[in-house]
Amino acid sequence: MKFRLLLTISIFSFTSPMSYAAKSKLEVYGDIAQYGIPLTAGLITAIHMDGEGMMQLAEGAFWTAATTEILKVSVDAQRPNGGTQSFPSGHTSAASQGAAYLQFRYGSVYGIPAYAAAVVVGYSRVEANKHYWRDVAAGMALATGIQYAITVGGISATNLVLIPYFDGDETGIYASLSF
């Protein structure tokens, strides 16, 4: 019971009003909770004194953010409001990464409320006319997949080697992953 209360208070403590006068409360929630959920995951991990888990959380956050930004620039999909870089939703991928970590590392007691909060982040992005549902779904799937590979699959950057390859007109990347 104490853990659920701590999780709820932590997630919603990041939703206090700031200088977002032109935005709806739902949009402000999405803006803040994209950071609040992963920060809450870090707080829970610290309470558990789980060093390995903290590394998995940090690595998942890094790879999720990097992959999201690479896709945004590469795809450059138009937003519903006419802006660019709609695909995938960065807010949703950030929130979902924290939720996925909590689910895979500590189970449903933490994972379900965190995923519920992440779904609201995704909903806020669609309601704010910033994303289509496909952008939100892709952000959630991307973050969940990356965090699964790290937390459950044991895949880590410490097991990955990337070396650029240049030979005349040929350019490439040598990649090696040990399991």
At which residue positions do the language-model features occur?
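Hydrophobic core of alpha-helical transmembrane segments in multi-pass integral membrane proteins
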Residues: 37-45
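Interfacial segments of alpha-helical transmembrane regions
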Residues: 44-63
